[in-house]
Amino acid sequence: MPKKDGHTHTQFSHHGTTEPLSAYLSHAVSQGFSDYTVTEHAPLPGAFLAQFTGPVDARDHSAMHEDELAQYCQLVDQLQDEFQSQLTIHRGFEVDFLVGFEQDTRQFLDKMADWTDEIVISVHFMPNKAGQLAPIDYTPEVLAAAFPEIVTAPQAVFARYFDTVQQSLDFAKTLSHPTKIRIGHLTLIRKYQKYFELPVFNHENLLKITTILNDMKSAGCELDFNSAGLRKPYNGEPYPTASIARQAVQLGIPLVYGSDAHQVADQGQDYDILENILNQPLDN
């Protein structure tokens, strides 16, 4: 695994610290990273925000605002020049896949194609039984309110999540510009596994994961190997889990470490742990 942090955030996330991007980059240099992708949450579509029925804070503080986009791009460009002798900086976004808003997302990516080197496509919101796009990683209480089956039938929620991830991958395969694409934190649905005492994935969901991985391989997508779950009190595992990560390696899918840092201290966290996971046999 290259010494690269491929999933990072900035002061524009609105749910992290206000530390400047330059501090993240200096920290990465001090940790021996050679490559760094800035992937702030892309602005969410206005039509999605207008119909969102979840917590106001989740609506307003999940992503960069549209009127900050130019400032974000200018800052990344400036620091790319300033750090060029110390760190290869790639310009990017973490893009939410939102069912029903694919055209809005496509228009944004087309508009930003000339500027963008890499994107992480992630599922943070998925449709519930009422058809509402609800956040899955905001709080355990919000997850349970939108998806009460997480308590009574968790495998059904897992299946709904992986179906949505599959849709995000199908969408990614339709993008025509040569931007490098990673699928973000593949097992984020387990963020609150200790809170809900979630079971391991059943056979049906493991098959869905295998299908996703095979499709990623065919499409030439990378996989975000995300350390954030190790820092979450109700999780304790990376995204994806160790066995899924090793399965991806066996299939020849490139894994890229992602700290998912929203504060400087988290940049580079647990890189060695994730690297060691990939050095273990597949069946461990």
Q: What is each residue range found by the language model?
A:
Residues H7, A28, I119, H185, ...:
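Divalent metal-coordination and catalytic microenvironments
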Residues P2, S13-H14, T18-L21, H27-V29, ...:
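Extended recognition/assembly regions associated with phosphoester-bond processing machinery
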Residues G46, K129, P233:
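Glycine/Thr-rich phosphate-binding loops of Rossmann-like dinucleotide-binding domains
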Residues M1-V99, Q103-Q107, K194-H203, S243, ...:
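An N-terminally biased module of ancient metal coordination in phosphate/nucleic-acid-related enzymes
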Residues S62-D215:
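Extended substrate/RNA-proximal surfaces in nucleic-acid metabolism proteins
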Residues N205, I209-A261, Q267:
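Active-site-adjacent C-terminal substructures of enzyme catalytic domains
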